[in-house]
Amino acid sequence: FGQDWTYFDFGEVMIAGGTAPDPAALSLPPERVNVVLLHGQVRGGGKGGEYSISFSKLKNKNIDYLALGHLHSYREATLDARGIACYSGCLMGRGFDECGRKGYVLLETVNSRVNHTFVPFASRVFHEIPFDVSGYASCPELESALRKETGNIPKTDFCRLVLKGQVDPECPPDIRQLQTDLAGSFALLRIRDETTLRIDPRDYENDISLKGEFIRRVLASEQDSAEQERIIACGLRALRGEEPEI
């Protein structure tokens, strides 16, 4: 396609597209099945930036199907009383920012109308699973719950577990052990630890142990709460004889 509208006549079907065409210049015969191809981000109205597509300016232009490219996930919306618009997305996700089913849209013309069907195509799918670990007292218990949560995900897919919630500072989730135990369940496994420590300073006010003194000093420091939690977590691992995760 050039910058302006380019038309391809296939008898019953007319296809039009351009890299930056003027919507006002689009001319489509009402008696034909009209498919328009554009690349950009849809906006409702007003001014937009580069790769911006105005829905309002494409209404009532005899469009039956507006094929859009730019977003990497399938989406569809009503254009007007006659037409619909679809982002087909990408054929396969390329990372955990492109989760979910990927594929293409199959168009069929029947009785001067166009029918569209999303066809899943990717052999492997990216999944991101948030999971609240609050209340799990042991790694085996948490592992069992995670296996149940992800039981419907095929082993050929890619999975990222995002652990959330508050955990006891004495027994935080062992990310390395979970990674080792669950790695064979998927083609690729990533675990992101977004948990926070459930610390009540009153629990350590009268604790005369090295641990108590360490936690009191960290909580009294000028570090922000996130950094305090990171330091406490590393310190407690070291006190237990484990390798701190810095």
Model-identified regions with their sequence ranges:
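His/Asp/Glu-rich metal-coordinating catalytic cores
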Residues: 1-86, 90-95, 99-101
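Short coil/turn segments at beta-strand junctions that form active-site/ligand-binding loops
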Residues: 32, 106, 153-157
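Short, surface-exposed amphipathic charged segments that create phosphate/polyanion-binding patches used
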Residues: 12-20, 103, 201-211
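Accessory, non-catalytic peripheral segments of nucleic-acid enzymes
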Residues: 111-246
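A conserved active-site cap/scaffold subdomain adjacent to cofactor or substrate pockets
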Residues: 69, 75-142
